[in-house]
Amino acid sequence: MDRFPDVSNVVLLTVDSLRADAVGAYDERRHTPVMDSLAADGTVFDRAFATGNWTPFSFPTMLSARPVFADTNRIGITESRALASVLSEAGIATAGFNAANGFLTSHWGYDAGFQEFEPFVASVGSSIYSRYLATHPTVEAWVQFATSPLRRAGSWLRRNTDDRPFLDTSRMFDVEHAATSFLEAADAPFFLWVHYMDAHTPYVPAPRYIREVSSNFFGTHRMLHAHLRTGLGWDVDERTLNELRTLYAAAVRQVDASIGRLREALEANGLAEETAIILAGDHGEEFQEHGHLAHYPKLYD
């Protein structure tokens, strides 16, 4: 059997803010068993570079082969030929599910060509609010993060230990369920795009994944403390920086587990052998290697 047999389908998995060295295939100290198994069975690119250090600067190239600001001063792909459009016109089924990144919505043209498209960005019926969400893509995540102590307390009172309240904050289950439903009904050939936000600040991983990557106890108060200091621009000491790294690693492992469930869905529907899986990050994440946290809009090299 060929190592790389002919495939009919493509699943593109993009993870917001995914550092290469957060994956075990690039750094053996990391705990990402599912991603590592993909790497072991496939091709690993050691010198692949994002075309930007921010979602609106990198995704135009990924989904429309257009460098941002190439011919206009705009972000998004409303004036570009989208990959999904080309595939759809060729008779390939297309679906895209984005875990609430406001920069990857129809407002910016990312629905083009997708027969099924869901950005999972909440709408409250206000055009002003909708425009605000489109340019502040993580505001919902910060609201969810601020209420995380209440969710943890509620889970404790209900003796609920499945961590679902934390997993819900990233819309991970929403995109996972949508993708699984698409796979159950899909007729080959198809193109499926899934975008995860778990590794984007604020990092709110479920406690089970914190325990997988760290032996240190990590309560909600420490999670709040670490993000509060960074959010307010205060000095971050080494302890807080290490806590942020731990939360980030746990969030990446959370995505890793979700990818594993999608692979199981491919297997269950008899699609695994004829489906290519592509895994990529849209940009990295900084932990003061160059003086900032998260992904500050700057170039250092």
Q: How does the language model describe each region?
A:
Residues 1-301:
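Catalytic domains that recognize anionic headgroups
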